[in-house]
Structures are given as C-alpha cells and as structure tokens.
Amino acid sequence: VHGCELEKARIAGLLHDCAKCIPNPKKLSMCAKAGIVVTDFERKNPFLLHAKLGAYVAEEVYKVKDPDILSAICWHTTGKPRMTQLEQIIYIADYIEPNRYKAPNLADIRKLAFEDLDLCMYRILRDTVEYLKENPKSMDLTTEAAYRYYKRLIEEEEE
C-alpha cells in the first residue's frame, strides 16, 4: 500500500475506531484518568476523543507498542500537518470507507487515494473545511492547520 508496511496498516486499520463506541462522558473520564490532554474543543465535541483514546486503548488493552501505529490511530480523525504515510493512509481510509456516501467528491477522492496521498489529503481537508464553514460548526485547530499545510504543499508542487 503506497510502499507502507502492510502489517502496520492492517493493525492501525483494525484498531483505529476501537474507542468509538465508548459513551462521550466515559471518554472524558477515561482521558482524565489516563492523563490524555483534552482541548476545550474536544471537551465540547467529545466524539473526537475516540482517536486519542483509541491510541491509548490500542496500547493498554491490545498491547500495541509501535509508535507509528499508535500515532496513525491518534490522528485519523482530525489529521495534522506533516502526516506520515501510515497516518495518511489511515486518515484517508477512514474518510473513504464503504459506508460513507454523503461526502462531496467521494468517487474522485476514492480514486485519488490510490494515486497521490498528499493531493488526496488536501482534497479531503478542503471539502471538510468547506463543509464546516457552511454548517454552523466550529473546527478543530489541528484540522485547520492540516488543511493549511496540505494546501501549501499542493500549491508549491504546482508551481
């Protein structure tokens, strides 16, 4: 998969949502007990914590020790600037999963996922930012930073 270690991608893919079904109040209390830093935005939108908490659960419950896998799980929801190839693959795979059908440009993004990870990241983040601006929702600062990073990266490649 894009030259990425398949076993790492497999484990991260299987475990990336391992904390998703935990009720939001419990997510907050588990993060507090585990010493996981929770931003004000995450406190107001605790569903986002399933990524950070998922990395913790993967390590503590499933005994995953590989920092690359744990990081891919941690960042699969918000993204971040300068994502590793594995982080990008898990982020993109989460976005293009078969049960998703409402996202704009999904067919193009699914095709792009097999061609250019950086451009695919930019397109997903661009669509996410546009969606969040059109709807009365605020945006995680890390997602905004990721969008700016990939936008700049793609613009530099086009020059």
Regions from the language model: what does each represent?
Residues 114, 129-130:
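N-terminal hydrophobic signal/anchor transmembrane helix of membrane proteins
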Residues 1-123:
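Divalent metal-dependent catalytic cores for phosphoryl transfer on phosphate-bearing substrates
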Residues 130-159:
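Charged phosphate-binding loop/patch that engages nucleotide di/tri-phosphates or the phosphate backbone
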